[in-house]
Regions:
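The feature marks non-catalytic terminal segments
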Residues: 194-199, 222
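Core structural elements
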Residues: 197-211
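ATP-dependent adenylate-handling active sites, centered on carboxylate activation for C-N bond formation
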Residues: 1-191, 213-262
Length: 267
């Protein structure tokens, strides 16, 4: 709790209300909104999707009841692009987004446009990615696992027929095991629960949100609060039974809104 409050207070002191964030039906954006409201930040909110999208419906319901405003953008309604202009869009995506955008460089121009749009009036962009630190992201039981079994459960789930003869599956996953050992500074082949929890921020989050955050910093200052060490290290020790089904996460949002109700539904 204190780590979150202090972090967002620093944001308030540096950027006041010139801060933008998405709001959706997920835990993470709603938790950021709750913390921001607690420290006095009036977020400039946006949501992407169609009118029938659950994210849009939930976001609009939240802002209505909280007396806030939100910028709703349906990316699918962008005008159809002619062949002549499409070259420029692909080229812009290639250079602006380092060809690392989530949906690829072949889009309708909405990716770059919305990144610019959401930061026109703000100095800082916040992304709730990483909020899974408060949930059982790996969906594994509360026990030790060998690194091999961990990889098998979460990563070795592909159809390798798409690979050429140059791909050596055995070698690839042996290297993956060694990489996990290096990340966790261990020589053991078995991981305890805390080590498994660490792999979310130190492995998965690093190569997911790290890329997106780097791209966002081309358009404005951008932060991913739940990826910060002072956030995720404290989350490692939350009992796994509370992380299941979003029990802790839901109560944490309520706690930020109505301080004092944390754990009320966690018996």
């Amino acid at each position: 709790y204190n780590a979150n409050i202090q972090y967002f207070k620093m944001i308030k002191n540096e950027f006041n209300n010139k801060v933008t964030s998405a709001l959706s039906g997920g835990f993470d954006s709603r938790l950021m909104l709750a913390i921001s409201k607690r420290v006095g930040i009036e977020l400039q909110l946006y949501v992407y999707g169609s009118d029938t999208s659950k994210d849009v419906k939930i976001a609009k319901n939240v802002v209505k009841n909280e007396n806030l405003s939100i910028d709703h953008v349906n990316r699918d309604k962008y005008s159809k692009i002619n062949k002549i202009d499409y070259h420029d869009i692909v080229e812009n995506n290639y250079y602006y987004l380092d060809c690392l955008c989530v949906t690829g460089i072949f889009d309708n121009g909405s990716d770059i446009d919305t990144r610019i749009r959401r930061t026109k009036k703000s100095l800082l962009h916040l992304n709730g990615g990483g909020g899974e630190i408060y949930r059982n992201f790996w969906e594994l039981s509360d026990k030790k696992f060998s690194i091999k079994k961990f990889i098998k459960s979460k990563y070795d789930i592909l159809d390798y027929s798409i690979c050429t003869a140059e791909f050596n599956k055995t070698s690839f996953y042996l290297n993956f095991e060694e990489k996990i050992k290096k990340i966790l500074s261990t020589s053991e082949n078995v991981l305890n629960r805390i080590q498994i929890e660490k792999l979310y921020p130190l492995l998965r989050l690093k190569y997911w949100m790290g890329i997106n955050n780097s791209i966002n910093n081309k358009f404005s200052y951008s932060l991913t609060p739940f990826a910060e060490p002072n956030m995720f290290y404290t989350s490692l020790y939350i009992p796994l039974k509370f992380k299941n089904l979003g029990i802790f996460n839901a109560n944490y949002v309520l706690h930020m809104i109505f301080r004092g109700c944390l754990y009320t539904n966690m018996s």
